[in-house]
Amino acid sequence: MAKYAAAIDQGTTSTRCMIFDHSGNVICYDQKEHEQIYPRPGWVEHSPDEIWERTQSVIRGALSKGGLSASDIVAVGITNQRETTVVWNRKTGRPVYNAIVWQDTRTDQICNELAADGGQDRFRPKVGLPLATYFSGPKIRWILDNVPGAREAAEAGDVVFGNIDTFLTWWLTGGPNGGVHVTDVTNASRTMLMNLETLDWDDEILGIMGIPRQMLPKIVPSSMVYGTATGELAGVPVAGILGDQQAAMVGQTCFDVGEAKNTYGTGSFMLLNTGTKLVPSKSGLLTTVCYKFGDQPAVYALEGSIAITGALVQWLRDNLGLITSSAEVEALANLVEDNGGIYFVPAFSGLFAPYWRSDARGVIVGLTRYVNKGHLARAVLEATAYQTREVLDAMEQDSGVKLTALKVDGGMVYNNTLMQFQADILGVPVIRPKVAETTSLGAAYAAGLAVGFWSNTDEMRANWGVDHTWTPQMDEATRERLYRGWKKAVTRTFDWVE
């Protein structure tokens, strides 16, 4: 009797296979990094072949570490770095070009040309996203325009597109020998090509971008049996697909309207469940699909993306040498009582949500002779909390929903000083769950739900447990005084790049 659910978590820097029991505990996992390819400034690529090879390797590794075989697994789910774009030959499985990664900015000119008629928000009413290099549509267009023979092959139906979820699902289910060509609604919602209301490809946008519809995968729910795995997981249903931030929402069991989670990594991503209602953003957030389970209606979310949070701690370590490991930032910050009156706004490459200002650059303001490295470390941590507050304010403004608590995950949630200050500056409790691997867990949940391993979302919610809660300890007057200072500091970053 199979008693575990598996997840393949294909991230920006590494690939993992993680196996969970019915209570949502990690039984075993394996992880491997892959190469980051930088052919030119601003260009970032991955080898799709290497990613598929790593995926097979971590599946083998995880099964072996747990002493398990395919017959022990009820279903496998996939979660992935979103927006990263692959175009490959349907007959051979060979990519026509490397995967163009979400951070890659080569499509800047394509985006500017598209924005010349109708502005940056030209497609936002239909797709919920601004025109930006971040999303897949312009990346597909670049490959069709720049790889010899790619456009003709796409029109003939010989080459196909997929994000990483689609590429892995196709290979897992047989590749050139009957592989299933699908993507789920969450990944499709990051292409700029899917209409958020119909949950189908938008022919008008495809026409404007010059992308043949026949190269696109079929859009499917996030939880259903898409096909059966071959190879290491032979016979196991492939039954769940979610983009990484959406998978974290499911892993955190944010199933009710108004529930939110914030993932603290290199940058930070906050998502708020808005239910079956599409909420357009007037405050610089993205409207996206949160999940769709089987034939139930799609659930939507607002997303706030922050470019630099954890990366600022790395900067303190690598560029200034004030600490030798990221974990030391907490002890350094705790040498002082407060920030000594300074604010650090990390607009190293402009500001993301809610400003979207590419002309901004980083500043440290309020310096006096009194300030020391402890104050600097504290200001670095506080910058993460202030940026999160700005996104939260934008979410409350757009949705009309008042947040009562924030669920958190990611690497920085083990920093108590930061998490306490986060609760203080938001004025709501901040909650860290027992199982921190929320992204992988979300993919396993989606797959297990499709085959009845978990019968409903209530069973998943029952698995979710609190590891630690930080409650606000700051009075309202102090909170607002500090936040006013931050808002003033942010204005000092504008209009720097001419």
Curated annotation (Swiss-Prot):
Coiled coil location: none
Domain of life: Bacteria
Family affiliation: Belongs to the FGGY kinase family.
Presence of the UniProt keyword Flavoprotein in the record: no
EC number: 2.7.1.30
CDD domains: ASKHA_NBD_FGGY_GK
Record GO biological process: glycerol catabolic process; glycerol metabolic process; glycerol-3-phosphate metabolic process
Name the UniProt record assigns to this protein: Glycerol kinase
Residues that bind ATP: 12-14, 266, 310, 314, 411
Annotated residues for binding of glycerol: 82-83, 134, 244-245
PANTHER family noted in UniProt: GLYCEROL KINASE, SUGAR KINASE
Known pathway: Polyol metabolism; glycerol degradation via glycerol kinase pathway; sn-glycerol 3-phosphate from glycerol: step 1/1
Residues annotated for ADP binding in this entry: 12, 16, 266, 310, 411, 415
Function: Key enzyme in the regulation of glycerol uptake and metabolism. Catalyzes the phosphorylation of glycerol to yield sn-glycerol 3-phosphate.
